[in-house]
Amino acid sequence: MDIKLVYSTSDPVGLTIKKLGYSFEEIDEDVTDFHYKNGEAIVIFSRHESKASIPSLTVHYPGNPSEEVMGGEPKKLGIAYPRLLTSILREIKKIDLDIEKTMEATHHGPTYQNVPVIFVEIGSDKTYWTNERIVRTLVDSTLKGIDKVDETDCRDYISGFGGPHYSKLFTKLADESCIGHVISKHYVDKLDDKVIIQAIANSVNNINKVVIDSLNLKQRERIIAALKSFDIHIQLR
């Protein structure tokens, strides 16, 4: 598979990658709204920002589950590639650094691509974005994950609804299964059926299991009803 590795010169992590001399695809657009579409899959490196400023290495898919948009289009999810994201995440989790390693729920753009896009991010401030040792370690682990994608074991292909934005549950499930879109609890009440269906259908690998994390009865019933046309196992947590 032709997997393109991408960075943006408008992003501090991208500038660090360029300084380190990696021969990846270079763009100058905002990472949340870029239009690069080459290859059969795209892995883009970028900064991660959070109010808590917790040092972190994260992976996630792009997509806007509601009308609220940060790049891309409203109520549109990107294409997930569970086997690839999980292979990368498993390698990141092996990094011997005292830094949080986690999967984030699907958020922000772009949503224009008809190939899967995976974000690999470093948080949460300039100290980490420009740290050449950390950036190099993350990039090299990502490359290992890409190299191992075809041998990645997936007990199930899982999409998720509920839980926090930084999901310990789905990060843990990735040890044995491969993870598609995760829609956090913050968006659940704003979802329409089309987005719920996209969370299953927009995937390179066929999703065979949905995990619903800590949602109330009304929220669970609505998601289950939207997925009634799918032959899929639903697990409540």
Curated annotation (Swiss-Prot):
Record bears the keyword Hydrolase: yes
Entry EC no(s): 3.1.1.96
Gene3D superfamilies in the cross-refs: AF0625-like
Keyword check for Hydrolase: yes
SUPFAM superfamilies in UniProt: AF0625-like
Database matches in InterPro entries: Deacylase_DtdA_archaea, DtdA
Enzymatic class: hydrolase
GO biological process assignments: D-amino acid catabolic process
Catalytic activity annotation: a D-aminoacyl-tRNA + H2O = a tRNA + a D-alpha-amino acid + H(+); glycyl-tRNA(Ala) + H2O = tRNA(Ala) + glycine + H(+)
Cofactor: binding comment: Binds 2 Zn(2+) ions per subunit.
Gene Ontology terms, MF aspect: D-aminoacyl-tRNA deacylase activity; zinc ion binding
Coiled coil: none
Source taxon at top rank: Archaea
Protein function: D-aminoacyl-tRNA deacylase with broad substrate specificity. By recycling D-aminoacyl-tRNA to D-amino acids and free tRNA molecules, this enzyme counteracts the toxicity associated with the formation of D-aminoacyl-tRNA entities in vivo.
Stated family: Belongs to the DtdA deacylase family.
Protein known as: D-aminoacyl-tRNA deacylase
Biological source species: Saccharolobus islandicus (strain L.S.2.15 / Lassen #1)
Name of the gene: dtdA
